[in-house]
Amino acid sequence: MITVTEATATAGALQRLADQGVSVWLDDLSRRRIESGNLAELIRTKNVVGVTTNPSIFQAAIGSGEGYEEQLADLATRGVTVDEAVRMMTTADVRAAADVLRGVYDASGGRDGRVSIEVDPRLAHDTAATVAEARQLSWLVDRPNVMIKIPATKAGLPAITEVIGAGISVNVTLIFSLERYREVMDAYLAGLEKAQAAGIDLAGIHSVASFFVSRVDSEIDKRLSLLGTEEALGLRGRAALANARLAYEAYENVFAGDRFTALAGARANAQRPLWASTGVKDPAFRDTLYVEELVAPGTVNTMPEATLDAAADHGDVRGDTVTGGYAQARADLAAVERLGVSYDEVVEQLEQEGVAKFEAAWQELLAAVTKSLDSKGVDGE
């Protein structure tokens, strides 16, 4: 348990992030974290103003069984299917977390205090099913501060437009490439235009675009290490930051453009960039690298708890480390390409792997819940 005095001493870097316009979200959720008061404590002591979840997070939380036994027993008695059971458990957690964050949501005018829940990853390549699932999740959670996560696959793009057009706030996930990010922003603007035409108040619609960071370095650095030249080794740890910085440049251009300006006149909100996958995988780098080097106004950084703790303990927040660095970012990516590492190939591979990883985690979760339901005498099929 962190005391108030300890929190004051350790949260300095996190407060400096907030001062720079960066919203700190926690990339984790479990029933124990909610019921123990830990989430509320992180809000009080570590500047946490939002929560993101994904299939892997729920697989770890529910798969452990801790805190879910009573609900599992109830669901088994009712004879629900395994898919229904998983949805009831995950939406219950998100609803409870949304209630914990409601004060933040109200105080920020809806900008923060958000909890994200992802559509079934098995639907990543089915537009109509994704839209239907997003609507159902919004209805099931039934909280104004929920965000529905939709993957930025080709099929996900029109789904984003439809869901935003229905007035539902969206967290677009699994973005790796600059080209796809531009398509995501276009889908968001099209959704706002659709909502406006339907007479929906645009002020109530919020969105973030989750741009994945560390996975880009992991894959590109692996290829650079195989090359083994001095130039190649010197570029390790730079591609992901360059990619993210150029994404921020694209964000600035789009949301300063005429199309969004017209929507802003109707009280529309810009879709904020969210830095995801910010836990550092390579021990050769500072464990706060993707926090310190991606400080820019109007962004979100969602962190696993280990990264959050590291940032609070020894984070070095020096102000904006993104804007103005675009020329160097372009040079870094060009250097990687020149060495024969294909950016397009890497980001396409990462998108495919990202969808596959979430689907695999979801299948593991379904298997674990099926086993729990079966052990209580009810068929989970």
UniProtKB/Swiss-Prot annotation:
Subcellular location as annotated: Cytoplasm
SUPFAM superfamilies linked to this entry: Aldolase
InterPro entries reported for this sequence: Aldolase_TIM (IPR013785), TAL/FSA (IPR001585), Transaldolase_2 (IPR004732), Transaldolase_AS (IPR018225)
Keywords: Cytoplasm, Pentose shunt, Schiff base, Transferase
Free-text function comment from the UniProt entry: Transaldolase is important for the balance of metabolites in the pentose-phosphate pathway.
Family assignment from sequence similarity: Belongs to the transaldolase family. Type 2 subfamily.
Name listed for the protein in its UniProt record: Transaldolase 1
A GO biological-process term: pentose-phosphate shunt
One Pfam family per UniProt: TAL_FSA
Principal location: cytoplasm
Active site residues per record: 149
Glycoprotein recorded as keyword: no
EC number: 2.2.1.2
Catalytic activity: D-sedoheptulose 7-phosphate + D-glyceraldehyde 3-phosphate = D-erythrose 4-phosphate + beta-D-fructose 6-phosphate
NCBIfam families: PRK03343.1, tal_mycobact
One Gene Ontology cellular component annotation held by this UniProt entry: cytoplasm
Pathway(s) served: Carbohydrate degradation; pentose phosphate pathway; D-glyceraldehyde 3-phosphate and beta-D-fructose 6-phosphate from D-ribose 5-phosphate and D-xylulose 5-phosphate (non-oxidative stage): step 2/3
UniProt KW Transcription regulation keyword: no
Gene3D superfamilies in alphabetical order: Aldolase class I
Origin species: Streptomyces coelicolor (strain ATCC BAA-471 / A3(2) / M145)
UniProt-recorded Gene Ontology molecular function terms: transaldolase activity
